[in-house]
């Protein structure tokens, strides 16, 4: 059904008005949305922020004003419909966004692809993926909360991928909103060279409109849903302030932009176009952040934000995307991908998200170079598998529209492609080209999981297979010793959400056990081995001898395992070396000290011996097993634990209590800062000591404190913690020895 038909079903005032505005914009039907634009008329943007800053509401308003949806719904609205972008039932219930839905829309004849990203720290891999494929972003800040912990995380990720951004201070209508404080936090906490390009006309309940400092006009949003925009002179009582703020904007811009700086020094007058051009240049170079204001819920400031996206954020042709050509024994060669939409260069695309929906597996891709048409063949650069394109679709949250071709800069989806997120697709498998893969953190928490009813086993395995494919930070394995299935992820909330999705989407209620920490075992110092595996009792025997050293890797590499073949000559024939490595990696899955994986170890195979008949790969594999057991007996071992970066924010009067609790949990406080009655503590705390902290923090700060944590590194745990872990493991294995030593008086 075309947009026009949908608007005509029902005669309410709003739909007629929307129809008129669409008529003015010249939209005739969905055909307008799916036609291809020149590269200057395309924007790929993400909307990311801290939890509850109003990202999804803002996206909903953008879709409404651009004529993409005919009516608006609130995230936690009374009509229980939920926002368009929150398409998962669980998201609508909790009012948080878990998966980034991709949508495209049209504003002033420019095609905007929007990716709505989650703001919760447990879902950072979603944000990482979204930022990887964007050209620009809108950072949404709450006018009350300001720069919060997750805002800083998102800011770090934007820096990692060099994403230019605009800042939008939302929720001006909330009690206690203070956009000026938020701006000073952006400068102090995030080190942004930022300044207002708009000012609010009144805050809290008397928020009337905004002042545009570039055009020196006041903007009012009138009519139902703020669809009519009225420009007026700046109110008398705000003229002095807006002049001062405009001067401040020009000074900040002049520091970052040479062209404007010269005009500033020569004291020449500035035109509106000079400022706009300087804003665009500095924003794309990430040397200045324009700050806009508004309130999405009360429909103020959204249309000027859309204008700013077109004016200041880059199109796909202005962003440099690199591909890497792998060459054996050399560093990969970097090449710049050509973003032109002419289809002359071969197709290159990156899969950034997988979803298993009701239509089978859906893979979201971004096209970086060339053109892709229905019926083409493409190759997965990692597996070299060929894929034939049967259907190409563009996404609008969870509805889709078929297209016949996509060009560089487009975001689209394919069906039934077997791949992992971060895979590169090309038309020529021989050029060994790949985009750099997306950075994925290691999981830090694991929990036992089991379906409540045995009859749900099939659905349970379907759900697990789908979630592990979609989310590289979600792992699943079966522990043979305790006969438990374990899932591991980035935090307790991460795993709880998956447990609830199993119940809701697959009708399979599950029980989660107590959280367990992913410890690791490593060597303290180098240890030599010389092991002979010999079994020659008749028939074909087994014979293998290996000599070498196992040694610890430096602390920065303590999550890796290395195998080095240093053999010379034919004492250990080369065809048997993989057997030794295989045996080493098998034994590394489970240490003998506490049953956790080994890490941070280098296995150096230096020499050995073989038998002309009885040696085999299996014999050398078993020899590696024996050598590692020997090193367990002779070497000294220690246990590593994950250390988390924890950040706690609470009112000043609770500072003593909060710092006391962190010290009690073996935390090392790395820094503190305070602003206007609130303080923030940064600490490094072992994950093992962080369970149950949320409840303790709430009770000790009267519910006002909040904290976030993210994985930092592995480091050796305290001796008493190590003794306790070893003792628990030995008891569970039935190896505990009674203590025979008597105390002497």
Swiss-Prot record:
Pfam families: EFG_C, EFG_III, EFG_IV, GTP_EFTU, GTP_EFTU_D2. PROSITE patterns: G_TR_1, G_TR_2. GO terms for biological process: mitochondrial translational elongation. GO terms for cellular component: mitochondrion; nucleus. Residues 40-317 form the tr-type G domain. GO terms for molecular function: GTP binding; GTPase activity; translation elongation factor activity. GTP binds at residues 49-56, 116-120, 170-173. It comes from the Eukaryota. It is found in: Mitochondrion. Pathway: Protein biosynthesis; polypeptide chain elongation. Keywords: Elongation factor, GTP-binding, Mitochondrion, Nucleotide-binding, Protein biosynthesis. Mitochondrial GTPase that catalyzes the GTP-dependent ribosomal translocation step during translation elongation. During this step, the ribosome changes from the pre-translocational (PRE) to the post-translocational (POST) state as the newly formed A-site-bound peptidyl-tRNA and P-site-bound deacylated tRNA move to the P and E sites, respectively. Catalyzes the coordinated movement of the two tRNA molecules, the mRNA and conformational changes in the ribosome. This is Elongation factor G, mitochondrial. It comes from Drosophila erecta (Fruit fly).
